[in-house]
Design a protein with these regions (language model features):
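Short, charge-patterned binding micro-sites
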Residues: 3, 41-62, 91
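Short glycine-/aliphatic-rich beta-strand segments at the starts of folded cytosolic domains
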Residues: 4-14, 18
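Beta-strand elements of well-folded, non-transmembrane domains
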Residues: 10-14, 34, 60
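A structural boundary/capping signal
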Residues: 11, 37, 73-75
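C-terminal binding/interaction regions
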Residues: 21
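Amphipathic alpha-helical assembly/interaction segments
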Residues: 31-33, 37-44, 67
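C-terminal structural segments of small proteins and small subunits
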Residues: 58-93
């Protein structure tokens, strides 16, 4: 069994309040959960209105499949005009 964990550090430059940031992040997490069927959560910078750290987990018996899925998620996030990827990390367990 392969577990892939993707963490993504984001900047939300258009956000002027926590409410603005949460709207962007909640929408992004919902879209990703529905499109890719992965576990997703905001894990850090909860009280910052311009930063967010998200984590995604995918389980499979094929590491190539997990890697491909998490790469697609990262590309999807990068294509979102409301946030910018500052850093990302991919780990396999």
């Amino acid at each position: 069994m392969i577990v892939g964990i993707l963490t993504v550090d984001l900047s939300v430059p258009g956000s002027n309040s926590l409410k603005d940031k949460r709207q962007v992040i909640k929408s992004l997490l919902t879209l990703i959960r529905n499109k890719f069927n992965v576990s997703a959560a905001e894990i850090d910078h909860l009280d910052s209105h311009r930063r967010a750290e998200l984590a995604f987990a995918c389980v499979s018996n094929d590491q190539a499949l997990v890697n491909k899925m998490l790469d697609k998620i990262l590309d999807f996030i990068r294509s979102n005009p409301l946030c910018e990827v500052v850093d990302s990390d991919l780990q396999f367990v």
